């Protein structure tokens, strides 16, 4: 096992396919468990891009709400300080969220040697007939996380989450 990095920076980007369209979120205030809701469309595919710093870290998959998304190494950035992985998250068969409700979905990403990244996203899944609702709110390019691995190498503490 290598040295435990002091900080791990990772970003997760979602883009609806086939046109690499933006994903939106809405600020809900304190009405629900979290103040931001990510809007997703059922029966759709999303490109998932994960960037990780330091570039020595390796990951094979991300679980989004229990759906395992295999990640493929895409590149190491030219300056060599980040590594980029991509995969496809499919919402086929996901039940639309009822009106006035939100769904917490668990996000997990197990890293070799340093533990598992875990967080929860508050999501609203819309069906095709309400697809225009998915585009109300603010688009985001990426969700960035600053994490600290714990000493037992079992999980990472999330210090900061930013929607950019």
Swiss-Prot record:
One Gene Ontology cellular component term attached to this UniProt record is:
plasma membrane
Top-level taxonomic group: Eukaryota
Bilayer-crossing regions: none
MF terms (GO), sorted A to Z: type 1 cannabinoid receptor binding
InterPro entries referenced in this protein's UniProt entry, alphabetically: CNRIP1 (IPR029204)
Return any one Pfam family short name. Answer: CNRIP1
* Known partners and oligomeric status: Interacts with the cannabinoid receptor CNR1 (via C-terminus). Does not interact with cannabinoid receptor CNR2.
Q: What does this protein do?
A: Suppresses cannabinoid receptor CNR1-mediated tonic inhibition of voltage-gated calcium channels.
Would you identify the family this protein belongs to, as annotated?
Answer: Belongs to the CNRIP family.
What protein name applies here? Answer: CB1 cannabinoid receptor-interacting protein 1
What gene is it encoded by? CNRIP1
């Amino acid at each position: 096992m290598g040295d435990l990095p002091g900080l791990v920076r990772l970003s997760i980007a979602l883009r609806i396919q086939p046109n690499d369209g933006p994903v939106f979120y809405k600020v809900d205030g304190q009405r629900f468990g979290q103040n931001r809701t990510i809007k997703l469309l059922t029966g759709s595919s999303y490109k998932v891009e994960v960037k990780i710093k330091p570039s020595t870290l390796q990951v094979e998959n991300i679980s989004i709400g229990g759906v395992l998304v295999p990640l493929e190494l895409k590149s190491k950035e030219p300056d060599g300080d980040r590594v980029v992985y991509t995969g496809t998250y499919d919402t086929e068969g996901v039940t639309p969220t009822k009106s006035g409700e939100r769904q917490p979905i668990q996000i997990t990403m197990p890293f070799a040697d340093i533990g598992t990244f875990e967080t929860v996203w508050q999501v609203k899944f819309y069906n095709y007939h309400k697809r225009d609702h998915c585009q109300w709110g603010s688009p985001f390019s990426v969700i960035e996380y600053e994490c600290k691995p714990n000493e037992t190498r079992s999980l990472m503490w999330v210090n900061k989450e930013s929607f950019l």
